[in-house]
């Protein structure tokens, strides 16, 4: 129809595994077409995610990399190594971003170690280095998410900002397209570059994606097609494509504006404050723990539970009956398997390891918390 459509897809390992278990070969084959057919490469970008739909801030730190690697392994097993090599962006479940310095550092380092080049983040989950919310303009440009741990080590990754909150209708009605139509170029790195409106839908909620999205997607692309030529008209574009075009224009992604997870400015402000000779002997990890404890004691609103697109809901409070067994299972898994894997990495291919890993990853699925009580928690 003369359109040049774009879409980014994020399927958890839970979902891919479930489709396989259900014997829905026709769905898997449709996804294989989107992942593997060269005609689809310019139009469809797959984003990586955790294998299970786990909330990063309250997932045990040693399991973050396991979640990332398990998804990559499963995706490659289904669609091949070439398809996996094209997966450069990461979509964290629930747009949940850790703000505890050590958790965020481990998360970003794991993403980088696993080959990811950029991350999609919720605008309210990040702040500028001096603790301010991102300006409207900054949410429409790429940023550099800096993660610093309690020992002062840093790692960073390019971040594209998802605006607004959790509302499937934002994608179901193609809100990003209509917002983008009214925008002008913005200054970045000595250039005037096109802003990017990035949005994500929370799967099938309330029939929106099934009943509203298909026609809205077509209508939006017809509007873009009919919007006139020239070099400045609005187009659909995927995340990696956008960043690669910026790099080709001479923009160095390592010089993007630096941002950090919310509440971290308050931590670093106290960490860097002058201290007595006695307190300066305290190591960084202990000092970080002290600072966080002091902030939590003085301000009940200060939280290290991370931020997501549902900031009115906590992923931690009231879920001890799920979180504590999950953490115990994780600790037992690593206590048992880590020495074995260190001595013989082929252990990860054994049925015992893979069954234990499967149950560990499944136990960390956020939906079991979000939906409260019942058979799972019992």
Language model features: what each stretch is:
Residues 1-89, 95-168, 175-194, 211-231:
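Catalytic alpha-helical scaffold of carbohydrate-active enzymes acting on polysaccharides/glycoconjugates
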Residues 1, 14, 136-167, 175-179, ...:
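Active-site and substrate-binding clefts of carbohydrate-active enzymes
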Residues 94-95, 203:
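Active-site metal-binding loops of divalent metal-dependent hydrolases
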